């Protein structure tokens, strides 16, 4: 299993009239968490794209427990429970500044060849870096 936590502050433009983070902006926080998890392992989306691989989101599931509020620092905990293959499943737990769980989510992404636009295995470098977490 691989886990990583990133912190992001809710900006004014991400909130609605009530001062809560607008529900559609949570997906961007998930992306920040995924990107920083990969970066923590020495990988980037841009390096995968340079190798001809994209990672589009296929599915997203969210459960809003409490609102994220303007100017709050949110901890985004990202969890990979199993070794990725053609698909990669991320789980997210968002915590407010009081360390209260405020949001649960999951995304399913697929590795896609930019040349064929068909699903494919991740690059070997990705597999090599992920394998130790799932042995």
Question: Where are the language model's segments positioned?
Answer:
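Terminal targeting signals and extreme-terminal segments of soluble enzymes
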Residues: 1-75, 83-135
